Amino acid sequence: MISASDMLAGLTGLGVTTVAGVPCSYLTPLINRVISDRATRYLTVTQEGEAAAVAAGSWLGGGLGCAITQNSGLGNMTNPLTSLLHPARIPAVVISTWRGRPGEKDEPQHHLMGRVTGDLFGLCDMEWSLLPDTPDALRGEFDVCREALARRELPYGFLLPQGVIADEPLDEEAPRSRAGRLVRHARTGPSDAAPTRVAALERLLAELPPAAAVVSTTGKTSRELYTLDDRDQHFYMVGAMGSAATVGLGVALHTPRPVVVVDGDGSALMRLGSLATVAAHAPGNLVHLILDNGVHDSTGGQRTLSSAVDLPAVAAACGYRAVHACGSLDDLTTALAGALATDGPTLIHLPIRPGSLAALGRPKVQPHEVARRFREFATEPWPASAVGSGTRAAAGSAGDR
């Protein structure tokens, strides 16, 4: 049997800065150890796909992320693993438990996944290994992982059987519940007077400081942003719909720069729990902008459910420090100025019209190139005082959980 300290030492030896995931009883000792360790950040998330997205953002911000899950949650991880981390060639460590291991007694819901877990790692183009139960063998497996991360620049998986890690006590305080401040700006006209997405993106680009990092959601938002002005500080999500907010969370926790997530209503609704995750971990330098056109523009304009959901009120209830419900581009300017000058996270909601630029092209730069130039930008030395004095990041403060 190995200790949780052995596991954590192996992870930090790889360079892991953040561990994010959904618990499993097999993982309890490791989770307890990471929570108690002041040098490593543990993020509770609402869904396993968020853990993979946080791991991606951690690397983009200059660290290395570890996503942990029960193997029943690997299905939720598959989308970001295959459509974000793989095409962008983002290294990460993925630790999955092995419930339903063939030959071991377990609950019926684990039997099928237990048979296919290793195959699923392989189908996601991940090299992986079984976590051993002796410290010497464990060090050897971490050496294998280190070499694979450097060679392939892709996620590497560990499969954790039952009873490998010894018990570890827990030292944790529950997050405090807090409601954010919601500002509803006056609407200036009918819905058909709402700005276009291009106009909103143009206003955003005009107002953002040069030091800001931008994570844009998949689909036409990223394509229009690329068309308007392709910059090193832009990370275009080409897949993993619904993950922009948690990618931005991972970035914001690793850099003092302001980080702006440009999201859509369909994407935000797809992983609505991410609002709770972002608010709970409260990076002060994160601005989350939702451009709400009420439709899935990239797939033909089918309606989303945003007309039935008060997204600003949801964000405030989840604990975003400030929420702005905007009605115009001028409201957006005001909200951005306030968000960049004060502690966040801040959510800005702006209704926009459906539709996009005619003959809209696609980024010609490859996802792995976008990821590397973004990481280089995010890790360049930069004084936090360059933006409003209230803006702060959790970078380097793993103890502030």
UniProtKB/Swiss-Prot annotation:
On whether Magnesium is a keyword of this UniProt record, the answer is yes
- List the Pfam families: TPP_enzyme_C, TPP_enzyme_N
Keywords of the record, alphabetical order, are: Antibiotic biosynthesis, Decarboxylase, Lyase, Magnesium, Thiamine pyrophosphate
Kindly indicate where the leader peptide sits in this chain.
none
Catalysed reaction equations from the record = 3-phosphonopyruvate + H(+) = phosphonoacetaldehyde + CO2
UniProt feature, compositional bias: Low complexity: 384-401
One GO molecular-function entry: phosphonopyruvate decarboxylase activity
Q: Which pathway features in its UniProt record?
A: Secondary metabolite biosynthesis; bialaphos biosynthesis
Q: Which GO terms describe its biological process?
A: antibiotic biosynthetic process; organic phosphonate biosynthetic process
Q: Which domain of life is it from?
A: Bacteria
> Is Magnesium tagged as a keyword?
yes
Segments carrying the region annotation (Disordered) are 382-401
**Cofactor(s) named in the record:** thiamine diphosphate; Mg(2+)
What this chain does, per the entry, is described as: Involved in the biosynthesis of phosphinothricin tripeptide (PTT), also known as bialaphos (BA), a natural-product antibiotic and potent herbicide. Catalyzes the decarboxylation of phosphonopyruvate (PnPy) to generate phosphonoacetaldehyde (PnAA).
What family does this belong to?
A: Belongs to the TPP enzyme family.
Q: Report what the protein is called.
A: Phosphonopyruvate decarboxylase
Species classification: Bacteria, Bacillati, Actinomycetota, Actinomycetes, Kitasatosporales
Q: Which gene encodes it?
A: bcpC
